Each structure stands twice: as structure tokens, then as C-alpha cells.
């Protein structure tokens, strides 16, 4: 929207930064959850299983979708060209995801890599979802929920500040 110039329509509307944040993040969450649920539905066809802790799974799904949506909005505000939009997902999120225990349990890593992986916020999202879906995880889900909450609060504060200042939006 910003690069195409249609963001002007939203900026002149009587919407505050909180309302813009809520709208963009809500839309991003819905999109992410639909993609995730469709992926899970296809996986059920090939390997049916029961969720070990459905409420924990739902909580981590919502929290993870929220954080990714807020970070996506912050990236969109920061980017000035289409090429820059892919910087954050490609050079930050993708490596953190692959090093975050998606394809392996961090409990199997040798030291010092196990300790280093605890500084990756993606580990806590992955382990929380792993616990909720499979009933097992290398980290306590309460710790993962706390880290996810702190990440959500921090990313929301930064993105809200960017919207409130009109950073790279009002040019």
C-alpha cells in the first residue's frame, strides 16, 4: 500500500495509529491462521493425529501469528522499495526459523549450540507449538509463553511508535 501510494487513503481517514495497527495486524493474523489451518488440514489427511494440548496449541498459534503480523507491518513501514520487503523474512526470519528447532529438537544439540539457541526467540514459538501439538518439548511451555508475550509487547510498541510518528509514511 505504501509503495503503491494507496496508504494515503488510510492516513487521511480519522483513524489513530492504534486502529491502523489493529486493522493491519488483524488482517495479517487471519491470513496466517488460514494458511496454517489449511496446512494442518492437509497434514491430517496424510498423518492423522490428535492435539495433545489444544488450548496451548491455540494460544501459541495466536501469539505467533500476532508477532509475525506485527513484525510484517513494521517491515512494510520500514521498506521503501519492493526489494526491501523481502530483507527481513529472507535474512532474519528464515535463518532464525531453521536454527530454531523446526526440524530437530534443541535438546539434541551439543553444547554450546544448545545454550546459544536459547537466545533465538523462534525456539520458544516452535517448542510451545511442539508441546501443544505433540505433548513434548525441550523447554517449559510457560517460559515459551512468557517470551512470546514479551516479544509481542516489544514488537507492538515499536510498530505503534512507527505508525504514530508516520515513519516513512508521510512523505
Task: Cite the ranges covered by each PLM segment.
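Short coil/turn motifs that cap or connect alpha-helices
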Residues: 16-17, 105
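Short cytosolic juxtamembrane segments of multi-pass membrane proteins
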Residues: 164-171
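Alpha-helical transmembrane segments and their short interhelical loops
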Residues: 17-89, 136-160
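Membrane-interfacial helix-loop-helix junctions in multi-pass membrane proteins
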Residues: 47-50, 97-154
